[in-house]
Amino acid sequence: MNPSAPSYPMASLYVGDLHPDVTEAMLYEKFSPAGPILSIRVCRDMITRRSLGYAYVNFQQPADAERALDTMNFDVIKGKPVRIMWSQRDPSLRKSGVGNIFIKNLDKSIDNKALYDTFSAFGNILSCKVVCDENGSKGYGFVHFETQEAAERAIEKMNGMLLNDRKVFVGRFKSRKEREAELGARAKEFTNVYIKNFGEDMDDERLKELFGKFGPALSVKVMTDESGKSKGFGFVSFERHEDAQKAVDEMNGKELNGKQIYVGRAQKKVERQTELKRKFEQMKQDRITRYQGVNLYVKNLDDGIDDERLRKEFSPFGTITSAKVMMEGGRSKGFGFVCFSSPEEATKAVTEMNGRIVATKPLYVALAQRKEERQAHLTNQYMQRMASVRAVPNPVINPYQPAPPSGYFMAAIPQTQNRAAYYPPSQIAQLRPSPRWTAQGARPHPFQNMPGAIRPAAPRPPFSTMRPASSQVPRVMSTQRVANTSTQTMGPRPAAAATAATPAVRTVPQYKYAAGVRNPQQHLNAQPQVTMQQPAVHVQGQEPLTASMLASAPPQEQKQMLGERLFPLIQAMHPSLAGKITGMLLEIDNSELLHMLESPESLRSKVDEAVAVLQAHQAKEAAQKAVNSATGVPTV
């Protein structure tokens, strides 16, 4: 092939049939001996970041790309032979059908390489593929030649020839639209009739007797099993279309031996599957449309609520077509569905019932979503949050991000340039005014109004509004734990004692976990212009969080209370991701978060969804880094 041919100025190769684990680095190692490479890209799913099984390799010189195509096609990478062809960026060239031929009735042993070797004698091949499924070859394939003349030579010489003792059909490639048009035309002039549901006592002679009155038949066959017993269906092939049509019109739906038989046009398996698929998709779409905006998802149900009670609670808002509490082993799973007759009734029910306490629990009520919609919504939410975090130029503390390795999480407060980059939460509360409180009112302490919390006895340290000499105040954490600490209440410390307890050198904070609650004690080494010290706060323990306790707390404290209880549970499942997952879950409605605290299964389900989103994002970043490290240039 001429390397300077105008067909391939980009020197770009398509590499298909890749193993799912093949990466850009592996392809670079494989193809770099052929010549300098500009870039490599393995195409991946946008959500899961899994490989789609093909990649593009861009060489600097067309001659190098041609060398790779000639010498490496069908080479094995991770146990799978790869299929290489020129990259056709113009889809019209691929879809026009010029130079493309179709081969069927192939032996199972013929693979891509054998097909390529067989047809390469007729001209340059752009692509060659045997169609396969999980069981191997499906018995047909395609060969795309560079010119139409080569394709016509292959059809002329190979059609009807034997390949591995099987007579193959070789013909011009036809698009699906062309095939469907031909099939539709043939369907109107059918002569083959399919009959079913006539029982086991039917044979060929009797079937011929039944249908012979409509016209001469070329063949009659009742399908039987290994023992010769009828399978209950058969075929009659007439000479003329008019006779076949008359048989269908008169015999379809008639009773035979007490059974209603079906008589219709015989269809190929692919045609029948296509029609059934179309009907199924239509039914699915109709069902989605019918329940759009009227089906409600109800969560956090009391164990004593059954279908009748659920219907009774929602019946004041309109006509209910169905109400179902999901059960497992005879016990309620804590959620169910209520379907109304109109979207207006469903909207009213959501407005009135969401958050209402029924029996002993507050309900979570929302429009029901399919699993795909929920996952897409969660992924979209996460991507938006990540984009907003990247858009902030200054250091940002992630929502409830643990300060490694202590596990203490901090509120998300963006820093300004005139302030130290990292502060403990209580000092941020002092320094940063919040629009949710008036200038005269002080912002509550993070642990204020929490059961079992003891407020610091020492007064708040003064601070300076002057810009510090350094743009950052370093944050020093430690994994040490305070040993042999009893559950005693801290009282005021004299100034002298406080001075004596603070050494001149930098100190390391120590932590104690009491009854599932973090007890941070931090010392901040500030610059000379900022003099601050975080008093120790000792939390004796936490009472179980109830709906009434949550409702009585100020709105700004509710997420804090929920986060304090969610974080240890999530940390037990995923220690390294606990901070990020907690921040993601805190965007959910409070009543649903309360249900998660009471239901480990519900919490684990939501945590698993969040982990899937995080892993997808991390895989995307890892793939990007792998490309940059392998090629040293940006991906195309």
Curated annotation (Swiss-Prot):
Domain annotation PABC: ranges: 542-619
N6-methyllysine PTM sites in chain numbering: 299
Residue ranges, annotated region (UNR-binding): 166-289
Any one GO cellular component localisation term in the record: cell leading edge
UniProt modified residues of type Phosphothreonine: 319
Intrachain S-S bonds: none
Span of domain RRM: 11-89, 99-175, 191-268, 294-370
Signal sequence region: none
Record-listed N-acetylmethionine modification sites: 1
UniProt cross-references to Pfam families, sorted A to Z: MLLE, RRM_1
Positions of post-translational Omega-N-methylated arginine modification: 455, 460
Example of a GO MF term: mRNA binding
Positions bearing Asymmetric dimethylarginine: 493
Gene3D superfamilies: 3.30.70.330, c-terminal domain of poly(a) binding protein
Domain comment in the entry: The RNA-binding domains RRM1 and RRM2 and the C-terminus (last 138 amino acids) regions interact respectively with the PABPC1-interacting motif-1 (PAM1) and -2 (PAM2) of PAIP1, respectively. The RNA-binding domains RRM2 and RRM3 and the C-terminus (last 138 amino acids) regions interact with the PABPC1-interacting motif-1 (PAM1) and -2 (PAM2) of PAIP2, respectively.
Protein's name according to its UniProt entry: Polyadenylate-binding protein 1
Originating organism: Rattus norvegicus (Rat)
Classification of source organism: Eukaryota, Metazoa, Chordata, Craniata, Vertebrata
Encoding gene, per UniProt annotation: Pabpc1
